[in-house]
Amino acid sequence: SDVCSGVTWTNNFTALSDDCGATGSATVTFTATDACGNASSSSATFTIEDTTVPSITAAANLTVQCDGAGNLGALNAWLASNGGATASDVCSGVVWTNNFTALSDDCGATGSATVTFTATDACGNASSSIATFTIEDTTVPSIPAAANLTVQCDGAGNPAALTAWLA
């Protein structure tokens, strides 16, 4: 306000700095000038922050039957889909990472891995979901049908015939 004349307001705003996603800040100088050319200025900063973590759905555990080769196709597809988890962020997209290193080898080509899937936005805010990939073997081994064998007594217990039959 000015006691003698009207005041014209101006500012030097050009754009927000784009720190991450839809955030940023700008320091603006506001100037009031009266009809006689007298001016007074004041500066202030306008800031948009993103401190909100991405919204994430839970990753799903997956159990597959052992394929004898490590189930790499199923494992890689599960990892690539972030265990089925999805994420969104109000200010930016997300980048996914996970901490998978290796399957534990419980027996043969089976095992499991507990994996943390993390969605991180452009400002470094992160949300995580944990799930387990398991390879199980529930298939019983197959063996040929055992054949009965009858031999003529040799008086010594037929060790050669017994050994051959057991092999």
What are these regions (language model features)?
Residues 1-167:
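Proline-threonine-serine-rich low-complexity tracts
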